[in-house]
UniProtKB/Swiss-Prot annotation:
This is UPF0612 protein P20C8.01c. Gene3D superfamilies: 1.20.5.170, 1.20.5.190. SUPFAM superfamilies: Tropomyosin. It comes from Schizosaccharomyces pombe (strain 972 / ATCC 24843) (Fission yeast). Residues 27-63, 138-225 form a coiled coil. One of its GO terms (cellular component) is cytoplasm. It comes from the Eukaryota.
Length: 247
């Protein structure tokens, strides 16, 4: 089987790994391709040659027709020139009138055309400007409508915020009143507690005074007890001595 690379290189080189049979087939196909290419070149050359001959004949025919017309027109011009000289009436060439009419007409036509073009341009620009202004006006109007809606919503929100602020202020006032009342109550309770502490302090002072008095009394009692004990002992000693003496 032939390799798939046989025609990938446009017959520049045979595939390097093909067998001898594959190479023969490649050579035959290459020869057929060369013959087909040469035949196509010959056909194109023949068509080009036929076209060249046809164009040459048409050119020669055209040159002959133009020369015949020119010769006839030149002969007619000479005859009319002789006739005008003999009659003494020399006319301006028609091309001058045609040039003047065409020139002036062309100038006015260009002027009017330019004016029409300018008018159309101005109209189109005016229409474009008007459309743009209308579009911008519509946009601005829509934005204003949207802004009015937003402002209305903001007003509603502001009214609600004012109401909420009033409610909060009322609650704050109530809380302040309650707080003030509670502070006054607490202050009164603290004052009462202070008074009780003062009373307790006074009672402690009185108790201290009483304790001091009791201490003094105890000291007096102790002193008296000591004297009583001493007297008792002395009396006992005296009694014992008297008993010894009596014995």
């Amino acid at each position: 089987m032939m390799s798939n690379e046989n025609f990938d290189n446009d017959y520049n080189l045979p595939p390097p790994n093909d067998s001898a049979e594959d190479l023969k087939i490649f050579i035959k196909r290459y020869e057929r391709s060369v013959d087909s290419t040469l035949l196509e070149i010959d056909e194109n050359k023949r068509e080009a040659l036929e076209k060249y001959i046809e164009e040459r004949d048409r050119k020669m025919k055209y040159e002959i027709e133009c020369n015949e017309r020119l010769q006839g027109w030149k002969k007619l011009a000479i005859e009319r020139e002789i006739s005008e000289e003999q009659s003494g009436e020399v006319q301006f060439p028609r091309w001058i009138d045609e040039w003047a009419n065409t020139k002036l007409g062309g100038i006015f036509e260009r002027i009017f055309s330019k004016m029409d073009s300018m008018q159309n341009d101005m109209n189109s620009r005016f229409d474009a400007m008007q459309n743009e202004m209308n579009s911008r006006f519509d946009t601005v109007q829509n934005e204003m409508t949207s802004m009015k809606g937003e402002m209305a919503e903001m007003k509603v929100e502001m009214v609600e915020m004012k109401r909420e602020t009033i409610r909060l202020n009322t609650r704050i006032d109530l809380l302040e009143q309650k707080t003030e009342a509670r502070f006054q109550s607490i202050e009164q309770r603290f004052n009462s507690i202070d008074q009780r502490f003062n009373s307790i302090d006074r009672r402690f002072d009185s108790m201290e005074q009483r304790l001091d008095s009791m201490d003094q009394k105890m000291e007096t009692i102790d002193a008296r007890s000591c004297r009583s004990i001493m007297l008792t002992r002395k009396l006992e000693n005296t009694t014992r001595s008297d008993q010894g003496y009596l014995a």
